A protein has these predicted regions:
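Small-aliphatic-rich amphipathic alpha-helix that forms the alpha element of a beta-alpha
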Residues: 62, 106, 119-162
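N-terminal amphipathic, basic helical "cap/leader" segment at the start of enzyme domains
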Residues: 1-104
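Short secondary-structure boundary segments
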Residues: 110, 152, 181
């Protein structure tokens, strides 16, 4: 049994508890105005300041990202080197001409081994990625980190160099979060 199946079985056990008549949810008051400010103020930023940013809380938040059956297939690679950021600025179609100016480029990948059913392999990785992207957007906004998502489009002739440099594990690339200061 792999780690994804173990996570799935834990998810099933939690779900069973929640369906029990004795289960009582522990909800907080969702009328908190700060929460709604984060929702309303979230934006995609493509121009960054030169201040340093602290991303440890953003990185730590990744463990809380929901995913299908709680398998947590998301992996990330964080790049802050000028040469690699410049290279990514040429490889990632949606980032041409601007992403190299950000403090960090967070490449997002999913491990296809997490998906057991053939029926879910074509679309579920992208649904999980979408949920992860929104989670990272909202967390970045709450932490006052400028952020923008870049779609996973890489020209066919550039895929080999991208994979050799940034995807040695052969995971499915699902996009990048570009992070910097306001």
């Amino acid at each position: 049994m792999d780690k994804y199946q173990e996570r799935y079985l834990k998810h099933q056990a939690r779900k069973k508890k929640m369906l029990s008549p004795s289960f009582k949810p522990k909800h907080k008051d969702h009328r908190n105005p700060k929460f709604w400010d984060v929702i309303k103020n979230r934006k995609s930023t493509r121009v960054f300041g030169d201040k340093d940013i602290k991303i440890d809380k953003l990185i730590n938040s990744i463990k809380y990202i929901p995913s299908s059956c709680d398998r947590k297939p998301l992996h990330f690679y964080l790049e802050d080197g000028a040469n690699n950021k410049a290279l990514l600025g040429g490889l990632l179609v949606g980032g041409v001409g601007w992403i190299h100016r950000a403090k960090y480029i967070m490449l997002l990948f999913v491990d296809m081994k997490a998906y057991k059913s053939p029926a879910e392999k074509d679309f579920m990785p992208y649904l999980d990625a979408g949920v992860a992207v929104e989670h990272l957007y909202l967390t970045a906004e709450a932490l006052n980190i400028a952020v923008c998502y870049v779609n996973p489009n890489i020209r066919e002739e550039n895929k080999e160099i991208f994979n050799k440099r940034f995807n040695k594990e052969g995971l499915l690339y699902v996009g990048a979060m570009i992070l910097g200061s306001y």
